[in-house]
């Protein structure tokens, strides 16, 4: 409380509060020098951090573009295989219609057996093609996932320091869960 009294006493004696425009007395030069030193010494630090962040972002974007291109390529391959399957289906339908008209002209019992045999062959052919296409697409997807996982594992556990830190962090979390 005594400090406040002293402040008001000094203000009353000096005729109020005023603005000091003397640059040397106010310490403005010191502040400007300090800011200049901070900018000069900090630009390398901030520049390296920003450059590292930029390269990480560029790498992530490039990886995403690569995955998009790969997915588009696989999609176009799957669409081609689907169109081939549709062609096979239309051929089977045409053959079935032709066989049906031919069989209707012949004996009913023989026609029924022949039609059943052809139909079963067509179904098995279609299922076989469908299975081959499915297995091919499945194998391509598995291969792509394994490649991506291996690349990501190398990036994540590339340095021993990062791997140790991750292992220690996991152990600490597990210890916390057990307690």
Swiss-Prot record:
Coiled coil: none
CDD domains per the UniProt record, alphabetical: ATP-synt_Fo_b
Disulfide-bond pairs as recorded: none
Regions that span the bilayer: 28-46
Keywords for this protein: ATP synthesis, CF(0), Chloroplast, Hydrogen ion transport, Ion transport, Membrane, Plastid, Thylakoid, Transmembrane, Transmembrane helix, Transport
Membrane topology: Single-pass membrane protein
Main location: plastid
GO annotation, cellular component aspect: chloroplast thylakoid membrane; proton-transporting ATP synthase complex
Classification via Pfam families: ATP-synt_B
Top-level taxonomic group: Eukaryota
Keyword Iron-sulfur assigned: no
Location within or outside the cell: Plastid, Chloroplast thylakoid membrane
Any one Gene Ontology molecular-function term assigned to this protein's record: proton-transporting ATP synthase activity, rotational mechanism
InterPro entries: ATP_synth_b/b'su_bac/chlpt
Subunit structure and binding partners: F-type ATPases have 2 components, F(1) - the catalytic core - and F(0) - the membrane proton channel. F(1) has five subunits: alpha(3), beta(3), gamma(1), delta(1), epsilon(1). F(0) has four main subunits: a(1), b(1), b'(1) and c(10-14). The alpha and beta chains form an alternating ring which encloses part of the gamma chain. F(1) is attached to F(0) by a central stalk formed by the gamma and epsilon chains, while a peripheral stalk is formed by the delta, b and b' chains.
Additional remarks: In plastids the F-type ATPase is also known as CF(1)CF(0).
Function summary: F(1)F(0) ATP synthase produces ATP from ADP in the presence of a proton or sodium gradient. F-type ATPases consist of two structural domains, F(1) containing the extramembraneous catalytic core and F(0) containing the membrane proton channel, linked together by a central stalk and a peripheral stalk. During catalysis, ATP synthesis in the catalytic domain of F(1) is coupled via a rotary mechanism of the central stalk subunits to proton translocation.
Family (UniProt): Belongs to the ATPase B chain family.
Name of protein: ATP synthase subunit b, chloroplastic
Encoding gene per record: atpF
């Amino acid at each position: 409380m005594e400090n406040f009294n002293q402040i008001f006493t000094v203000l009353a004696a000096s005729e109020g509060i005023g603005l000091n425009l003397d640059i040397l007395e106010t310490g403005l030069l010191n502040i400007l020098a300090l800011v200049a030193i901070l900018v000069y010494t900090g630009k390398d630090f901030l520049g390296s951090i920003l450059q590292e962040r930029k390269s990480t972002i560029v790498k992530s974007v490039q990886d995403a573009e690569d995955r998009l291109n790969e997915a588009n390529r696989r999609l176009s391959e799957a669409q081609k295989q689907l169109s081939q399957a549709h062609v096979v289906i239309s051929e089977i339908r045409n053959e079935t219609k032709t066989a049906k008209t031919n069989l209707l002209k012949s004996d009913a019992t023989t026609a029924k057996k022949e039609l059943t045999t052809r139909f079963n062959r067509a179904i098995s052919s279609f299922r076989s093609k469908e299975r081959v296409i499915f297995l091919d697409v499945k194998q391509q997807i598995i291969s792509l996932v394994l490649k991506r996982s291996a690349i990501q594992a190398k990036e994540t556990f590339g340095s021993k320091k990062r791997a140790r830190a991750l292992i220690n962090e996991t152990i600490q979390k597990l210890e916390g869960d057990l307690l």
